[in-house]
Structure formats: structure tokens, C-alpha cells
Amino acid sequence: MHSLKKVTFEDVAIDFTQEEWAMMDTSKRKLYRDVMLENISHLVSLGYQISKSYIILQLEQGKELWREGREFLQDQNPDRESALKKKHMISMHPITRKDASTSMTMENSLILEDPFECNDSGEDCTHSSTITQRLLTHSGKKPYVSKQCGKSLRNLFSPKPHKQIHTKGKSYQCNLCEKAYTNCFRLRRHKMTHTGERPYACHLCGKAFTQCSHLRRHEKTHTGERPYKCHQCGKAFIQSFNLRRHERTHLGKKCYECDKSGKAFSQSSGFRGNKIIHTGEKPHACLLCGKAFSLSSDLR
């Protein structure tokens, strides 16, 4: 097996300025440390070698320094399953230039098992990758860059699915209709159209949905909540995209034009429906009799 390239600490680190670090409370600092530890643990479990050169560079520049509690494993066997089961990982502590000469200590750090409540959004997160995304979303940082297009990415592990955008790779294929997707989440959601599964049910009326976002949107019909209001006429909407679509009626703007007939539409749904007429495509099939239709409204 060929050896994997050496990865520096900079490849997995998320840098914060001194001002940003000062604004984070104790729980978020501890959370940041735990998330960084698990990111490094993932890389080590895959057989990557972690270089400590970045730590020395940070010390020379007087920036925030992260100190290691024990040596990184250099010849780790890439047994991902057993490595991810380890409860004790590398421990790292934030120190400054002032106390950098103090002796390094060893401390065990446990993988997060309890949900963390995000102070900015109020949502509970259990998995560290979710927590990482939550922190980066609020901070606005995108520390990883795509080599193909230069696009900045928030997650260390997002370059792989992002790369599939360039290669048009669709590795997840439905075994019922052979439709393919770039990630397993979209495939699972698609399979619900075959099985009829609707796991998200409204506790008020019992109506069920395939996606959690659809359930939340439906629940607003019970509460009467319409948070998106048009500043020109005062009309309010449940969803933001409905407001944007409505605003185009004031402008008289038609952004979607058919290249075959020249017909223009103010809404993407109307444009897609017109396009299907030209192609003859019938993507909406009945699960009971197999008859297919061009429009979902005809299927219903």
C-alpha cells in the first residue's frame, strides 16, 4: 500500500484572530479544541502523517499556539473502524508566547457524547462534524480551498463531494430506476418516492412529509406565521422564496427565457414546465400503475 502524503497542522486547523478568540466563551473554546482533535483523529485513522511544523511557525509569529499533549502516531495502520472507536485522543491546549516555554503536559480528551447547544442558533448538535459546520457558519470562515476552481469551503471533508461537481461524478445510484446522485443523502431522499415513506409527521394534523424542512414549512400554516413581508404592498409569506417570486411581479421581471420558443417566465417552475413540453420528458410516475406525467400536478 502506498504511503499517504504528510499533512501539516495547518491543513486541519481553523484559525481565529485574537479578537475573535476573545469573543468566544469557555464552552465554545473547549468545543473548538474537541472538534479539532476529532478532525486530526480522522486523518490519523486514514493513515496520514501529521507534521508539527505549523506549531513552530505560530510560535515565531506570536500568534495563537496549540500545544500537543502527546506525540502524533507516525505509522498508523489505516484501520478506520478501530481507530474511530478510541475514546482517548491527542490533547491540545491554547497557550501564548508568554508561557510557551512551560513543560508540555499530557491530558486525555474524550470524544463528545452529549449534545452541544449552539448559542447563536439555539439548535442541538451531537456529531462533531455538525458542530464544526455550525461554528464555521456563524464565524463566516471558509479555511479550505478547492484546487480546481479556488472556491473556499468550510469543511475539511467537503472537498471530496465538491470535487465531484467538477468531474460530474455521481457515485450513488438508485437500484430501482438507475437515477444517480452525488451524495447518499439525496439518494435516500429520492428512494422515498419509490417506497412512499414519509418519516416527518405533523403532530397537529397528522400530515406526513419526506423532508424535515417541508414539515417545518407546513407547521407555519397552523400557527399563521408569515415572517417574510413585501415592503411594497405589505403582503406576507411563509417562505422567503415565495416573497422573492412575489417581488418580481412588482418589477415585471421575467428572468427565465426558453431558448427554443423564446417564451419568458418570471418563475423557474413555469420555465421548467415549458421545457418538459419541448423534451417530452415525463419524470412523474405513478407507483401503482406506472403511468408517467410531465407535471407533478397531473400525477396528483
Curated annotation (Swiss-Prot):
Subcellular location: Nucleus
PROSITE patterns the record matches: KRAB, ZINC_FINGER_C2H2_1, ZINC_FINGER_C2H2_2
CC annotations in GO: chromatin; nucleus
Gene Ontology biological process terms in this record: regulation of transcription by RNA polymerase II
Main location: nucleus
Alphabetized GO MF terms: DNA-binding transcription factor activity, RNA polymerase II-specific; RNA polymerase II transcription regulatory region sequence-specific DNA binding; zinc ion binding
InterPro entries noted in UniProt: KRAB, KRAB_dom_sf, Znf_C2H2_sf, Znf_C2H2_type
Top-level taxon of origin: Eukaryota
ZnF (C2H2-type) residues: 172-194, 200-222, 228-250
Homology family: Belongs to the krueppel C2H2-type zinc-finger protein family.
Protein name: Zinc finger protein 705A
Organism ancestry: Eukaryota, Metazoa, Chordata, Craniata, Vertebrata
